[in-house]
C-alpha cells in the first residue's frame, strides 16, 4: 500500500521545498492520527525516509493545539535535515520521556505529551542532538536541587515554577511541605543562623541598609510584632548599661587625735590660702591642733552668711568645747535675751531656770523672801542656771516660824512701792527689788476680803482649790493661815502644788493681818 504522500512530486516542485508563504495551508492536509502509528516498510530512497518521518511527526489540528508558526518552524527544520536519517518514532518517544523525568519544563523548552495519540510534538531545538545535550546540561545544573513532582510527567509547570500563586495557597503548600519534609526545619534554622551571623559582621550603615530592605517587604502583622518587640526590649530595665560607680575620694587622715571640731577646718592647708578663707563653714575659735594637715577639707563648699565677731557673743557661749551648731544658735539668738521682758516676745518664764525647785519641800520661814528673790533673779537672768532655794531640812518650831514671818513682813513694809491697792504682790525682798506680778488668784484684795475670810469654801474657790473645802472648812481663817505643810498634808491636802499655793496665800493674809489692813468685820 502506498503512502498518501507519495503521490506528491519530488524535487523543486515538491510542496516541501517551497517557501513558507507559498503554501500556508499545506501542512493542514495531513492524514488522520491513526496513520502515525504505522511504520514505513523500508523505503530505499532517502527522500522517502524523510517523507515518512515527516508524516510520522506532523499531526492533524485535532490532535494538538500548536500555533501555525510553530508547526511551520518544525516542518522547515525537518526538510532542511532531510539528508540525514531521522530517528525512528519509538526512539524519539523514549528520549522524550527520559528528558521529562530528568528536568522540569522551562521557558525555552515546552513539552506536550499525549498518551492517547501515542505521539509527541517537540520543538525543533529538541530534534538536534547537540542542542538537546546542551539544553539538558544547562537545565539540570539549575534544577538539580528541586524534586520533581509526579504531576509533571505531562509537562505541567510545577508549584516551584515562575507562575505566582495566591498567598493563602503558598502558606498552605509551605506548611504541607514542611510537614512532609523533616529536613525543612533543620535547613530553615541553619539559614536563620547564617543570616544572623552575616548581619552581625556588617557595620552600622550596612545594617541600616539591610533593615530598610527587610522592613519594606514584611507584612503588616510582622511589622506590628516587630514594633511590639522593640518597645518591650526598650522598656526592659536590664538592657540599659550599668552606671559606673562614682565615689568621692577618701581623704588620707592620720591617726593623730583631733582636739575639737575646729581642727577639721583649721588644719587644712587650704585655710592658709587667703583666697579660700571665706569658704570655711566656721572660723577658728580654738588653737591650732598638733596634727598633720589632711589632703582634702570637709564641707569647704558651704559658706556661712551669718558670721559674727567674737565680741558680740555673750559670756555663756565662750566655751571652746561647744559644737558649731550650738555656736550658730547662740550667735543668732544672743541679742534677744538682752531686751526687757516686756519687749522680748521669746521671753522664757522662770520655770525654765529652776522649775524643779518648786517640787522640793521648803521651809515655811523662808517662803516669802525666797519667792520674791527667785522671781527677781529669773527676770534678769532667765537662762542662768540657779540652784534650788528650797532644801529638804527639818521644819522649825512654832515660835521660830512666827519670828521669821515677822521679819519677812517688816522688810516689805519699808518698801515705798507697797500698797493695798496694787494689782501685784507687795511682797518684796529686803534688797529693794521691784515687785513681780502674780496670778490673779493671788490677788491680796480678794484674799483679804472679809466675806471670803468668813466663808472658807468660797475663799478656797477663789484659789481654785474648792475640792479641799471639806477638809479645811471646819478651821477658822485666823488659825488656818498659820498651818504648815505637814499639817495641811494631815488634813487631807495631799497634792504638793495645792499645799504650796495655800502656803503662799497664807503668807499674803498674814502680811495684811500684821499691818492691820484687813477689815474688822472679818474677825
From Swiss-Prot:
Localization in the cell: Cytoplasm, Cytosol; Cytoplasm, P-body
A Pfam family that the UniProt record links to this protein: SAM_2
Region: Disordered, residue numbers: 1-57, 85-105, 150-187, 305-448
Segments of skewed composition (Polar residues): 150-162, 316-335, 385-415
GO molecular function, one term: nucleotide binding
Keywords: Cytoplasm, Nucleotide-binding, Protein transport, RNA-binding, Transport
A biological process from GO: positive regulation of DNA metabolic process
Cross-referenced InterPro entries: SAM (IPR001660), SAM/pointed_sf (IPR013761), SMAUG/VTS1_RNA-bind (IPR050897), VTS1_SAM (IPR037635)
Ranges of residues in domain SAM: 451-512
Other information: Present with 3200 molecules/cell in log phase SD medium.
Subunit structure: Monomer. Binds to RNA.
Annotated protein name in UniProt: RNA-binding protein VTS1
Gene: VTS1
